[in-house]
């Protein structure tokens, strides 16, 4: 199963694409040098398969590469980061 995480700035969201289909999204809006993530969602047919984890890993990798931070308002996104001390430096 091939997957990629892509930023879609026109729709203000990150997308996890698996085999050509968007299966998970993280909505965001820009704030200074950070993104605010109020919502993460996975297609019901793909829940329970770690898709949102893959999405968040890609989002954080992109933020790290672009020297930006995150404000995780979504409980899932917040828990994902809190459970990974190595990612907490990305918190705004």
Residue ranges and their predicted role:
Residues 62-75:
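Conserved GNAT acetyl-CoA-binding A-motif
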Residues 1-6:
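Conserved N-terminal entry element of GNAT/NAT acetyltransferase domains
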Residues 13-23:
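Conserved beta-hairpin
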Residues 40-47:
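A short, internal acetyl-CoA/4′-phosphopantetheine-binding micro-motif in the GNAT/acyltransferase core
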Residues 21-29, 36:
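Conserved beta-strand in the GNAT
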Residues 8-10, 31:
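Structural motif
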Residues 48-61:
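Conserved acetyl-CoA-binding loop-helix of GNAT-fold acetyltransferases
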Residues 88-91:
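Short, hinge-like loop/turn segments at secondary-structure boundaries
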């Amino acid at each position: 199963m091939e997957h990629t995480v892509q930023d879609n700035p026109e729709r203000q969201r990150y997308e996890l694409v698996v085999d050509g289909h968007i299966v998970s999204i993280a909505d965001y809006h820009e704030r200074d040098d950070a993104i605010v993530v109020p919502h993460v969602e996975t297609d019901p047919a793909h829940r329970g398969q770690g898709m949102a984890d893959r999405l968040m890993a890609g989002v954080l990798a992109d933020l790290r590469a672009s020297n930006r931070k995150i404000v995780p308002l979504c409980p899932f996104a917040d828990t994902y980061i809190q459970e990974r001390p190595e990612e907490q430096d990305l918190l705004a």
